[in-house]
Amino acid sequence: MNVVVDTHTHTLASGHAYSTIIENAQSAQNKGLKLLCTTDHAPEMPGAPHYWYFNNQRILPRFLHQVGILRGVEANILNVKGEIDLPFSSDQHLDWVIASFHEPVFAPASEAEHTAALLNVIKSGRIDVLGHSGNPNYPFDIERVLQCAKEYNVAIEVNNTSLTGKSRKGSDVRCDKIVEIGKEIGVYFTTGSDAHFCEEIARLDLAIALLEKYEIAEDKIITTSTSRFLNFLLLRGKLAIPEFERLY
């Protein structure tokens, strides 16, 4: 499987990552990526930037080191209502919005509460993908949430860092189940390194192996071509990005 997009990456701006966007783009080019989503942590995460940072991504060039740059965020799910920590005015400036649970922002609660939060954030229409949903601290009704994700064309991330055992320990078992059920339901999958250092960009080996284990069709993995990824954004109701015309 050839993956040409990394949809989950962090820069210095996240507060606990160690590279600039230029360093990340250089690494992406060196590793053969065509598109890179830059997705720093949203404001409620300790150390994260103000929402102006995300709005101001409009000043970023569309290409750095010949790699297309998608302006994104890893937003925090705040509550069971499915609210996220950016104002609605930020939405127009963002190409790619991940929604994730993080312990400092949403304390682990019951399976019912996690499920409600995920269903509501999907239905909000503000997010494009659920991030590292295999975290065992946040059990949820996998079938209900993935059915909802399919209905609303929200992708499910296979997070490589979650599969290493170094972060969110125990995620591998739940990630396996999520991919298995996701195949049956027919959700869209995406692959994210969750890189917090430039050398981790495009480190997707474990995510790819899991998708291959369940023989997920490439047309359901939106990172296997620039066309699949960008057309998924159109499916989500996003406007076409003129600078990427040749990549559709």
From Swiss-Prot:
Keywords: Hydrolase, Metal-binding, Zinc. Binds 3 Zn(2+) ions per subunit. Its cofactor is Zn(2+). GO terms for cellular component: cytosol. It is an enzyme of class 3 (hydrolase). Zn(2+) 2 binds at residues 16, 41, 196. Pfam families: PHP. It comes from the Bacteria. Zn(2+) 1 binds at residues 8, 10, 74, 194. Zn(2+) 3 binds at residues 74, 102, 132. GO terms for molecular function: phosphatase activity; zinc ion binding. GO terms for biological process: bacterial-type flagellum-dependent swarming motility. Its EC number is 3.1.3.-. InterPro entries: Phosphatase_YcdX_put, PHP_dom, PHP_phosphatase, Pol/His_phosphatase_N, Pol/histidinol_Pase-like. Gene3D superfamilies: Metal-dependent hydrolases (3.20.20.140). Transmembrane segments: none annotated. HAMAP family: YcdX_phosphat. NCBIfam families: PRK09248.1. Belongs to the PHP family. This is Probable phosphatase VFMJ11_A0091. It comes from Aliivibrio fischeri (strain MJ11).
